[in-house]
Every structure is written in C-alpha cells, then in structure tokens.
C-alpha cells in the first residue's frame, strides 16, 4: 500500500462544441482529444451528470483498448476522479481492459460505473480515433437520460476539478495506491481474472479442453487484431482450454493496432480470411479493438453474424449456463436478419426486435426477459453481462463443436459448416449481406436518405412490383416505414432508427445513416432474403441477392446518383 496526499485544484475552462456522446460514447480524432482541457471537460461532465451522493466514495472501473493516448487519458481520469470525490478506481493492468471484462467487473464488484476508453473497431494511432464512454452500475452503456445530461454539462462547463498529486507511474504492477488516509484509492487489477471467473460459470471449460485433446487434428486460429483481447487470448485459449499458443496471432496490443483497422470482418482481417479460405484451420475467429465484436469462420466457410446468433440460440442446451437456467427470450437489432426470429418461434420463447445499440438489449436483460441477442455488425452476447462479447461468442462455438463431436474422431468430425447447414435444413436460410459506404460527405448522404424517406412517407412504394434482374422473380413491396421502437420495459420511444422496405415474400431492404466514424458519414444498406427450398440453400450469397441489391441501390435509392459511389468500402 502506497500512501500519499493530494489537494483539489480548480481549473477554469470553456465548452468545446460537438461533445455529444452517441450510442457508443464520444469518438473523435486523437488530435482533437489532445487539445488542452478537451478530454478534461468531458470527464468532468460525466461526474457532473452523476448524483453527488452516489459519486462520493464510489468505485469506478477504468480501462481501455490500448490505443494511442489511452494511458495519458487514464492518468487524467485518476486526477479528476479523486478531486470529484470518487473513493476507489479499479484500473486494468497496463491500462488494458476489454469492454466485456469491464462490464463483468462492474457487476462483480458492485461499482457505480465505468469509464471506458475505446473507439471500438475504429483505427488508432496519433492520427487515428479516440473514444470514451460511461457505463452504468449494471455494466451496460449509459441510457440517453445520462448521455444527454453529460452533453448538457459539456455545453456550459466553466471549471474542472482536478489534482496534480495523483498518478500511477507503472500500471504494469498489480498494486494498491492510497491518498489522504484512504479517502481515494487506485487498485491496479489483473485484466482477466474477474472475466475468466465469470466465463467458467457459463461454459464447460473442462469439456472443451477434453474436446481439444481428443481431436488432435482440430485446428484453431484466433486473431486479436492487435487489440485488447490479445491480453486475454493466451490466458483463455491456451492456459484454460489447452489450445496451442501458436494458434494465436496479433495478440500484442498495439497503440495503432499494428497499422491495421481492428474491425473483424472479411475486409479488415485479410490474413485470417485467406488462411480460412485456403482450408488451413477448422475454426478461425477474430475480435475487434475493445473485444466486444467477433467474426467466426469455418474451413472455407464464412459464418454470417446473423446466422451465428441463431445457431447459438438453437443449440442453447449445449451451453451449461442456458441448459441450467433456460432461455428467457431472444432478441436482435432491426437490421439483423430474421434468422433468430424463426428459432424463437420454434422454441416458443419471447422475441424482440430493437434498434441498433446494445443498451436496448440491456433493458430487456435487466427485466429478466432476454437471454441471447445479437447484431449483424459482428456483435453477439447474452445476459451474463450488459455488453456484446466477442470472446464469449467464440467460446460458444467451441462449446457447440464440443457438443456435436462428443462421439466423433478426426475422420467423422462435425464442422462449423455442417452445423450451420443442419440449421438451414431445419429453419430455412436467410441470405443476408450489408454494404457499407464509408466517409461520404454528409450532405449527399442525407439527400439520398431523404429521397428514400419521401417515397416511404408518401406510401408510393406499397404495392410496387419489381422484376428481378437475375432470377426473374417478382418482388412486390408489402410495407415500408421508418423504424420506431417502444421499449416494453420503460415505454421510452426511439424514432428514426432505419428505413425499412419489406416485400411480400419476407425479403427486406434497410437503409441507415451512421455517424460512428470521426469523419464523414457512413451509409449502410442491408439485404435479407428468406429461402426454404432445399435445392436453394447453398447458393453464393451475392448471386442469390443480386436482384434485391439492384432494386435497393438502383431502383429505389439511386445511391450512385446521390453519392457518386459505385462500390461499397465493405461487404459483409
């Protein structure tokens, strides 16, 4: 125990424009965040938005994904937290904590909340992005009532409470530091301990280890994409599950993610995708910068995130946590394919369709009505925490493989592809794809969305028929709207969550304008087509969706006309 003292200092400041946190907190360029008082203003505004009686003497968890400026920001948070009456900071070793691990720690240690330093899957480095968000005592993202309060304080802030006498020189040491006779404490904790303990209550680690041992030819590859889960990879996959350390790549967290884009998809994880397409591994997986997203691949087989959550749900009995406690309900974000809904119907459990944003799942979980959920954007999770969880999803699939291969050997091994195709044979297949058009100037992006919105508002699309350019099928629009969600728990209403066009055969086209990047806008277009014919379940996705894609991009939105873009940056 290192005992020291500090005094509170008041620093005058002025508001910065644009400090409005979104679904994933505040994300800005590093160069902007490093401006004098910029980050200090936002951190002080977080504390100003919290009830003073709850803040005083409270425990706050702090950590991040290790991107550039992470540890400088942590030292700043220490100083402002101490001056604002926080009693204890739990900080991850080296300043590293995955977002799922933070959620687990908050819940396990009854913390008031957490300050998470991450821009998730956005690039890092001196010219990259930086992010900060506040999570609540349930371990989940702050609701709009809190984020709006934070923003309001950023617009009127005049001073920052801080101190010059609080710092931890070496975050690599697992030690406890004390100031003012215990009035303020910083404890550097192991980044993985609480999280691994939780995972052991969910999965049969011994069973998975036995599966790995009994199938010596089973090959596995995990790509941490130089993000925070590199700090967890060896501990979980090698030490706990018996997978050779040589199967882990890019597991050294890097301030700029080793020059990469830590977004686990087919575009930004090219090395892993190439290896899997070459058939080098039975299972390949990747996680993003802060560890909440996942991509899973089988040998020469891409597992769509929408299918992944559906298969996990349909195999819930293979996972001890759900086999023991049962399924309370299933949910997906609106743009995610309808595959999960068919599982919910079959299992006779409640189903929820919510806007994009994990906080909507959190409300349902806190009310005890939701167990498993997912987003098409490579986010999958359950009620074990209140964030999506990339490592959890990967272990789910290891557990499912273990279940399906209890009596197999290397000759009759049941693969990821076979498990998914068994699922399609039972439930049908949702052919699904998402096109991302990134860093578009805001004005043309908004003009395109307005063009689609006007067609929806006028009802002129309802009953309109299109002939498929590739399949000659007739596509008739049954309904269209701007998705609105009324939360069944707190009755809050979330409007303008995405433009939906639904066809008579159940096919869907969805348009969304996203602002999670630090520059420009991203237009996302989603295509979802349901197929039950046995002879049509194994087609190429882009070929099968060609007609629907043409209708969406050319006939309805005229995307090229408005944005000048001929091709998306990312196809999922």
Swiss-Prot record:
GO biological processes: carbohydrate metabolic process; glucose metabolic process
This protein's UniProt keywords: Carbohydrate metabolism, Cytoplasm, Glucose metabolism, Isomerase, Magnesium, Metal-binding, Phosphoprotein
Binding annotation for Mg(2+): 120, 288, 290, 292
Keyword ATP-binding: no
Annotated catalytic residues: 120 (phosphoserine intermediate)
Pfam families: PGM1_C_vert_fung, PGM_PMM_I, PGM_PMM_II, PGM_PMM_III
Gene3D superfamilies referenced in this protein's UniProt entry, alphabetically: Alpha-D-Glucose-1,6-Bisphosphate, subunit A, domain 3, Alpha-D-phosphohexomutase, C-terminal domain
Protein known as: Phosphoglucomutase-1
Gene label: pgmA
